[in-house]
Swiss-Prot record:
Belongs to the transposase 7 family. It comes from Pseudomonas aeruginosa. Keywords: DNA recombination, DNA-binding, Plasmid, Transposable element, Transposition. This is Transposase for transposon Tn501. GO terms for molecular function: DNA binding; transposase activity. The lineage of its organism: Bacteria, Pseudomonadati, Pseudomonadota, Gammaproteobacteria, Pseudomonadales.
Amino acid sequence: MPRRLILSATERGTLLALPESQDDLIRYYTFNDSDLSLIRQRRGDANRLGFAVQLCLLRYPGYALGTDSELPEPVILWVAKQVQTDPASWTKYGERDVTRREHAQELRTYLQLAPFGLSDFRALVRELTELAQQTDKGLLLAGQALESLRQKRRILPALSVIDRACSEAIARANRRVYRALVEPLTDSHRAKLDELLKLKAGSSITWLTWLRQAPLKPNSRHMLEHIERLKTFQLVDLPEVLGRHIHQNRLLKLAREGGQMTPKDLGKFEPQRRYATLAAVVLESTATVIDELVDLHDRILVKLFSGAKHKHQQQFQKQGKAINDKVRLYSKIGQALLEAKEAGSDPYAAIEAVIPWDEFTESVSEAELLARPEGFDHLHLVGENFATLRRYTPALLEVLELRAAPAAQGVLAAVQTLREMNADNLRKVPADAPTAFIKPRWKPLVITPEGLDRRFYEICALSELKNALRSGDIWVKGSRQFRDFDDYLLPAEKFAALKREQALPLAINPNSDQYLEERLQLLDEQLATVARLAKDNELPDAILTESGLKITPLDAAVPDRAQALIDQTSQLLPRIKITELLMDVDDWTGFSRHFTHLKDGAEAKDRTLLLSAILGDAINLGLTKMAESSPGLTYAKLSWLQAWHIRDETYSAALAELVNHQYQHAFAAHWGDGTTSSSDGQRFRAGGRGESTGHVNPKYGSEPGRLFYTHISDQYAPFSTRVVNVGVRDSTYVLDGLLYHESDLRIEEHYTDTAGFTDHVFALMHLLGFRFAPRIRDLGETKLYVPQGVQTYPTLRPLIGGTLNIKHVRAHWDDILRLASSIKQGTVTASLMLRKLGSYPRQNGLAVALRELGRIERTLFILDWLQSVELRRRVHAGLNKGEARNSLARAVFFNRLGEIRDRSFEQQRYRASGLNLVTAAIVLWNTVYLERATQGLVEAGKPVDGELLQFLSPLGWEHINLTGDYVWRQSRRLEDGKFRPLRMPGKP
């Protein structure tokens, strides 16, 4: 059986692609005087040109010219121009093979290159094995191999040799990973791992299948079941050191492979691989269960508190009429008493003139019942749900291993008290129980004359535990999402080394004094400029007075002439089925090749099956209904393909392919250069089985839902999407899309709406090199912050909210740089850090310092906004593109009433990724045919104003048939270079 190739044909072409753009030709193939002197020693144009070309190829990419090498025309033209020869003479070079070999030998000596030999192959495999322990992606390994050989000044061998070296390195790395996971295991561990493949007692599924099931609903019953899962994992009792020296990517991939396999498949593995795979599954699944338990507990508490608040409001509203009646009555009584005092008459008689004394006495009693305590709050109603918490919290606290930072030691001590009370079945809280963690709001309920109230002490401790877990002040052993805050960051030694070497991956001056002096000086100048413009009433389309700020709304952005062109081009676009559109786009881009097999990296053999699974995600149909709607397909086939070929990383790679094609398409340049983008959240209601996984945000009503948060470039390409909770602020995820997309876009400026900004985001955006420009609603209410000691600006007084605490920034400068560097290098995601920073108590030093830094940037941005109508137009236009893209997404995601009905978060992610991929395909297809439509108008004698092309949009879908049976007719595929006919008037 032939060895499976690591590199695909496309990847091979990418690795040794020759430069063709003018900039790249100048960079790689510009000769110096020494080069030209050597070249001129050749006789005849053909020899000079051939010798020069060989010199170029040996220098970059680094391989020798073969007898059958085909070179791009731009390379020949550029080299010929430099050596002043006729490009046509290239065809005559190498007629004598001896000449070509002699030239190659001379150039090897000149460039000090050595041929690639067996010893080099062995050394390369050893080197690649280290990298292969981190990733088994062939393209990354091959790229590293080529770079290493160039540094060692070796002539590159054939790519088949590189492929073989990568393959051997991956095999060696796999064996090392297996060995690292298996050697620490005892016979007892192995026996317990084997037990996981057996049927669970009284069930038709194995222990492993049951253990990997996600909780269905956030309630006490499912919490207890999930706690049992964690206890079962803990009984396996794997060594603590297991997996610590294995790269997380490899461990996760091995766990995914094991999760997709049947017990029968796993049982067929040789022992070392079987135990390694099972150990990886247990390690990853244990962390997942811990994170899910903490999240479930968080959601249950949020639900109980929200319910108490809602009930509190309902009670208050129900008593509103009675309270109003009492207020009106006592107002009359008060007025009567005032008049009686002025007249010197009997006050009691005055009261009885308003209401009989018996009724007055009764009204006072009623008022006492209606009256609320001074700390009018809903917390007392939370106690009604104490029984819900008691069903599972004793088991939860017992199974979680908690650690705490100094700031949360009081909370951890309270948790330990609860554990001891549960163990001893105590009903009363000990008098010496810790109370320092109790916030003022809770004290009246917890600390009573009779002692500490058991219900409210426990609820308060659990609530504070939830907050501390969110912020990272308390962490859980074995968790991924709830670890020690410092564990997420670059190691202190590595950060110190980067700073010392001036190699921090940040876009600012790392010297705090110089940086702050520069920013504060700029801030002072901008404040003075805006104050002067406001005083002279010269702010463009804005007025600032004592009563506040007023900005004139922007005019309509689309002129009438542009609308006519929009209508003309949309009528010309060919009508097409969504299946045919996806086949067209895949023929152009080959995006389907990125959906590789999880185990061996092979491309999907059945493209129709793959595209059907993707489309099933995109239109929210699901695999079962997709199989019914696609002749020749079955659920089993689609399910198998999804399990092995569809993952987050394959969706990301395929999306990047489409975004890159859009980025490189000439017509897309009419809409932007790919350096600006916007992001927005789109809510989808959670229904059916997915309802229990949804979250409620009062902004969207009382129904649960999920948010698809998507980034879109100025060229309309949606380059990132993720599923988030509707209860989390959009700003948490803004940076993720900018930092972790895989496309060639180089975003410099980013737009969001009001929900997309916080001061922390402003700070991190600036530190990481992005210009942040949110469209802030009620801008006049968003205050400016000024440096201490600067002159006052009376004109700006309505906008100024306070002074900046620069001392805090200086004190925590290294912490800020370390955090930003960690995010940039991918040690931790921006969203995770922003969630934790947002959950910190107000006194946390890093959170406050980052907020102050963000206030500087937010103030500078607002001052810029007030001075620039062009900035307002850019932001408005960018956000409009995102909103229009949401309309397209809503149209595509039409099945199941547009509701999220998938129970697992993984399936919900696939829905979002499939939707984003298909909308990106529609955008690219429309871009191609909008260009052809404008060309068609010109050819028909209807001139097109180039200035109006920016107003066209590739987001239309009226010409696309999204419904019906999903048939993939290969007969409808186009030949290379062919296009579908436009709907020109007068043509059939």
